[in-house]
Amino acid sequence: AVVFPKNSSDIQAVLELTTQQKSCHSIKITARGGGTGTNGQSLTEGIVLDCSRYMNRILETNFKQGWVRVEPGVVLDQLNEHLAPQEVFFAPDLSPSNRATLGGMVNTDACGKGSRIYGRTSDHVLALSCVLSNGETLESVPLDEDKLSAYKQKSGIVGEVFKVVDQIVLEKADLIEEVFPKMSRFMTGYNLAKVYGNSEKNFNLNYLLSGSEGTLAVVSELKLRLTALPKYKRLLVVKYEHFDDALRDAQILVENDPAAIETIDEKILSLAKEDEIYLKIKDFIVDEKQKSGKKTRKTRTISLLEFCGNNKNKLEKQVSA
């Protein structure tokens, strides 16, 4: 079965039913976005909660302060088309951007091309409105010590959430520091390391909710940070005879701080040569003559480097370095 909620109250009603009615306790509720995840996250034998049909409105945009408020069913391309005239965008850049919903992006803490400089979805979340398993609503924003203390005093399961999470991340701080790798892209799950280990050093439940795959709460509304569109972009194509050579060069290429690097192997290039797109990209993948002009080096692998920024001279230096 599929439920298409029209608002937060509908989500509350569904979750209240499954917790308060004994006959419904065994029913599993699975939130679904655009269904673009590759790990089968939205597959279930229970009830699918699909917010994409009705909860897909852009509620409020504040270009001066740089944020937007949306419902979880808004699609990434839909939002960025709305923002483009003001030369801003929501930075995480996913390949299925014409289908991926913002609610799904938060729940998987999605990132894509450009994540080296823009980070993950969670790095752009300012606030989340959520519905907990018993139907109670929870508002998540970064909290300083005084505000966190006030949130802990809230009645019901909401106050308990803030108490328990704060207790866990403080008591297990050494273990969290030891276990969680110092990498920008490493996991989807309960990101305990960022609850306090964020740039503002405040208690931030957004990082825990992001990437939790809907297992902690159902997101009903999002407030997201906007980013200025880069004025200039450059694409650099580096050709290789062997795939291993491209892998060895990766660390060197990263030092020039590209927004994205993508390496394409011989199998994909051979498929591209059989496709109608070949005429558009053939200059990127043809074999290269060596400087002597006598020998030809086979192009079996290419690395695509994208550079972007607002300073044209700086960008040209990056590309030519």
Label every PLM stretch briefly.
Residues 35-38, 42, 105-114, 202-227:
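Conserved phosphate/anionic-ligand binding catalytic regions in large, soluble enzymes, centered on
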Residues 25-28, 90-94, 170-189, 247, ...:
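Flexible, glycine/charged-enriched surface loops at secondary-structure junctions
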Residues 229-242, 257-260, 299-303:
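Short glycine-/aliphatic-rich beta-strand segments at the starts of folded cytosolic domains
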Residues 143, 222-224, 247, 254-321:
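Terminal amphipathic helices with adjacent charged low-complexity linkers/tails
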Residues 152-197:
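Flexible inter-domain linker/hinge segments
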Residues 36-38, 96-103, 188-191, 195, ...:
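A glycine-rich phosphate-binding loop feature that marks nucleotide/adenosyl-phosphate handling sites
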Residues 51-53, 126-130, 194, 207-212, ...:
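Short beta-strand elements
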Residues 1-25, 29, 47, 51-96, ...:
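N-terminal glycine-rich flavin-associated loop
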